[in-house]
Amino acid sequence: MDHYCTVRDMNHGIKPKDGPVLVTGASRGVGSIAAMILASMGYRVTASTGRPEEAAWLYKTVGVEEIINRSELASPGKPLQKERWAAAIDTVGSHTLCNACAGVRYGSIVAACGMAQGMDLMGNVAPFILRGVTLKGIDSVMFAKEKRAAIWQQAVQYLPESRMDSLTTVYPLSDAITVAEKLLSGGIRGRAVIQCS
């Protein structure tokens, strides 16, 4: 649900013609789904990933138009950087989130919904007070159940079940520990679902 909330809240008046949207962690669950929804809505997606071996999958299945290596964003950067993206969805946190804020265009929005790199936010106020950038936190935990149902109904038009299946791998409960280890080491592509029955 947080992937669609992220895309919906990210809109902020940003239109596909305004330029590419950065999605960090794009080869993982939330990132790949957010990227696919954006592409389905007509946005050009720049995917940040540390898994170059997933390039063909990101281009063909997810629908991204550009891939950058996560190392470009993973270290401390300048307070303001070249305006590269019309908006950003960050699933990573830490330096990556700070660099996304520093690299979006004037009046843009960055939606933060993850902390794979870390919970720290060691940035500065320059993007917010000099470019009017909005940082929007996405809460998928306390979000009201009724609103979730409405959002899922809207999301289906951009991400039908057949496309969602192309991003999802289902594992038996007996593989949960192995899958968790692979997930923590970056070895899972897309969305991992553990079947409990």
Where are these regions (language model features)?
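Short internal alpha-helix immediately C-terminal to a glycine-rich phosphate-binding loop
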Residues: 1-40
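Adenosine-nucleotide cofactor-binding segment
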Residues: 39-95
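Glycine-rich phosphate-binding loop and adjacent beta-alpha segment
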Residues: 95-161, 196
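Short, flexible, glycine-rich and Lys/Arg-enriched loop motifs at helix boundaries
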Residues: 10-18, 68-85, 142-143, 163
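Residues at the starts of beta-strands that form the adenosine-phosphate
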Residues: 20, 43-45, 109, 134
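Alpha-helical segments flanking ligand/cofactor-binding loops in enzyme cores
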Residues: 35-36, 56, 98-101, 126, ...
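C-terminal hydrophobic helical "lid"/dimerization subdomain
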Residues: 146-197
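Short, well-ordered alpha-helical microsegments
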Residues: 31, 55, 97-98, 120-121, ...
